[in-house]
Amino acid sequence: LASAVCGLCLYASFAPLRWWFLAPVGVAVLVAALRGRRPRAAFGTGFLAGLAFFGLLVDWASESTGTWVARAGLGAVLALYTAAMALVWRELFESLGDRPLLLAPALATVWVAVEQLRGAWPLGGMPWGTLAFGQVDGPLLRLAPYGSSQAVGFAVVAAGVLLEAAVRVARRGGKASAIGASACCLAAAGLVFGPLFLPLPPVSAGTGTVAVGFVQGRIPAKSEVSGRLRALTVTENLAAATRRLEGRGADLVLWPESASDLDAHTDPDAGAVVEEASRRLGVPLLLGTQRYPGDYRYNDYIAWLPDRGPSGRYTKQHPVPFGEYMPARGFFRLFTSAVDQIYLDMRAGSGPALLDVNAGGRRLRVAVPICFEIGYEGIVNEAVRKGAQFIAVPTNNASFGHSAESRQQFDMTRFLSAETGRTAIQVSTVGVSGVAEPDGRVHHMTEPWRPEARLARVALRSGTTPATRVHGYAAAFYLAGAALGGLALAQGLNRPGGNGKRREKGGR
């Protein structure tokens, strides 16, 4: 039951609910559930908590594939990380005892390190469910430009550990216990609300502004049209919606990922639609297209200049396993035929995720992480360190139906805007699309599954936040801390009685 409550609380902190304050509560429940557990029970408790959390969070995986296997499989794999973390936590309980001021930073360090590992390995990792991405409506967002998702996640977990300690100490009764519980509550509140008093880092906004249009089209149902004609219809629908921006003074217009699944470089029909839209606007158009050089494909985001055609390209460097390419296809076909829905594997390009384009009488440098790449902070931070003035996040969410996937992704966009000190625009094939500001404000939001065209005045910023500068080093720090925790676990399990036979208070 405690595992389910933990998972529910963590899930509720993310979109669509965004009850950010439940994340520390979920952590507190997990801490309480793990106290006194033997190793095997701790692993099981952590796994069930992770399964409840991720199984709810990634419901869009079944929406995308049409089978429950994808959701269950992805949820179970991600839950293994929570299970492994629970084992390390359990050993830290044994080593550090009942000392919340030591346990809070220790457990938080391990949690963040496991998130870093999960976001990088295997197959490039999966950052979905990083605790910080559920805090965009809370006070901890102000911590993002100073310490990235790592510091925010650390604060959430440490606050949860202190909350559990406060409840446990208060139940003992007596004046000393009341004082101790109050101190733990105050410390937890300070971690969560203290960042409200932090100023925004002094990232320069002195390079002016630019008028950026972004367009959300309409994806026809497969029953309406299919194959090549369906891909061309998507591009035509975007071009039709783009006409709403004509004469409104846009300097640059963004289309989403997969705006042209036909190669706009080589397909004459797709290229003609894009060229006409760019020429009518009279400004550069950034759009997603695909290349098919052989029995594989690339996912590109390109600049298209009126009367000149393609000029500049970024190729997605982090294709999504099981979504854009199928690893070990033969093996996984033993479990489901859904693997063959991906009939042409996508290959990785290289970074940085940048496009340079002349617009509004100046040379612009735009960070362009494609779709899920917005969750990989290293990709975005690299682009900003190399001079990106704002962030465009082209994405195709059509496969995920009416699930919360696009809103969860937009929250990542919001977080990275705050982390990097850059205005960020998410532009989706079907929504949601919108603009996120570094101070947490959101504007020009679209309704999903409706053609939309919006025009936003975007500040062009230079300079970097502390988080952008140190993100990679901080990740190494947390991983080193977790490695020490892992050594403690190994030593603990090798001690006499370390297999769980030694007496433990409250053993179950």
Which residues does each predicted region cover?
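Cytoplasmic C-terminal tails of single-pass
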Residues: 499-508
